Amino acid sequence: MKPSVILYKALPDDLLQRLQEHFTVHQVANLSPQTVEQNAAIFAEAEGLLGSNENVDAALLEKMPKLRATSTISVGYDNFDVDALTARKILLMHTPTVLTETVADTLMALVLSTARRVVEVAERVKAGEWTASIGPDWYGTDVHHKTLGIVGMGRIGMALAQRAHFGFNMPILYNARRHHKEAEERFNARYCDLDTLLQESDFVCLILPLTDETYHLFGAEQFGKMKSSAIFINAGRGPVVDENALIAALQKGEIHAAGLDVFEQEPLSVDSPLLSMANVVAVPHIGSATHETRYGMAACAVDNLIDALQGKVEKNCVNPHVAD
């Protein structure tokens, strides 16, 4: 008899078929308490869980005594109670490598669109304001040869540094938990403390996961140390930034502009002051949102779950010691 797994996000037909070759698959709309209660017997028997954008906490795990592995269609896993999973010897699988290049593209797009005011001036054209040759009030700022500060030099940070160094001749500063020899050798990146990065960078790109240590890492103090001409980019996790402090910094002119793919609360409230600021490019968490990459992430998540439930945990596992 095939192991039972619960799928809480739709998959392309071919990936669903691959999953069904190995497991009895039960599809549910979400992991809300109501859904769990209505499908109590299914949850009680499930050995695997696959999906994204839902919280997996101790309360849910209590309803799933046979769960052995959960696979998320994402690189981030701050919506999972890792301690609770580990205590129950449940493997947590994620998709850390599939989306690297695509998210780096998104970061570079935010750098360019904020600096050159692409969204703002495009809207002015659509509004019929382009009635003569443009003047300085339409101008943006250069990206090439400007200093890029990267906070978090992981896979995505490296991919961004590659684009900035080779494509735009940008000097690169970075701050991370440790020195990154490859970044320094390939891109001439310079390691520095966070204060130095903030003070010297023309663009500050935040690429950090959400943890207890990174929550509200960026607040009024950090924005106050940035150049008034600096542009802030966040495509990591929204709560790493104190959004009220960011709004205040933009309103006071402490920083020049912001390009944001993530927010403290998502979806972003329609009455957020960020949406009324011409110098803010706000997009709906599109970091990995291309057809190709989202398919690749789903395929990776399916393979991860198959491997985990077959005892083949060699990569993409958040808590691999559980398998020991």
Curated annotation (Swiss-Prot):
Compartment(s) where it occurs, according to its Swiss-Prot or TrEMBL record: Cytoplasm
SUPFAM superfamilies: Formate/glycerate dehydrogenase catalytic domain-like, NAD(P)-binding Rossmann-fold domains
EC number: 1.1.1.79, 1.1.1.81
GO CC terms, sorted: cytosol; plasma membrane
Pfam families: 2-Hacid_dh, 2-Hacid_dh_C
Family, similarity comment: Belongs to the D-isomer specific 2-hydroxyacid dehydrogenase family. GhrB subfamily.
Name of the protein in its database record: Glyoxylate/hydroxypyruvate reductase B
Biological source species: Escherichia coli O6:K15:H31 (strain 536 / UPEC)
